[in-house]
Amino acid sequence: MTVGRTWAVVLTGLHGDLIEVEADLSSQTPAFVIIGLADKAIGEAHQRVHNACANSELPLPRRKLTVNLSPASLPKQGSALDVAIAIAALATEHALDRDSLAQTAHIGELGLDGRLRPVPGVLPAVAAAARMGIRKAVVPFANREEAALVEGVEVL
């Protein structure tokens, strides 16, 4: 599989929008490109994701990796998409369960060592994901109790 997909959530105030995170591998010169109206923090995600994956012994492929954050017209900000970007990127070459990824929102910042760091706004993010049919959420441990307040979502 060369295209990996999963879900994330971006917040505007307390309003959350579901974002499809797609990663595609191509045989071009190695690069890591993020597209889809991302701010500087998301633009820097490629370095956090690359180092976190390498330091977790899950190195990313040495090919061109393009990550699309859709809908492209919606502004995206902050580091809470790091985990979703990493999962979509890893799904391009690793056998991750597509059905599970299609039902899961990944929310959190990655440390360079691979740790998940807490992010603000997990409660409204998970609530927005639940309203849009998402039934599982991967969040940093420090945000777990907050995320668990949303009924109908399994917090991992």
Regions found by a protein language model. Name each.
Residues M1-L156:
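Peripheral, non-AAA+ core regions of ATP-driven protein-machinery
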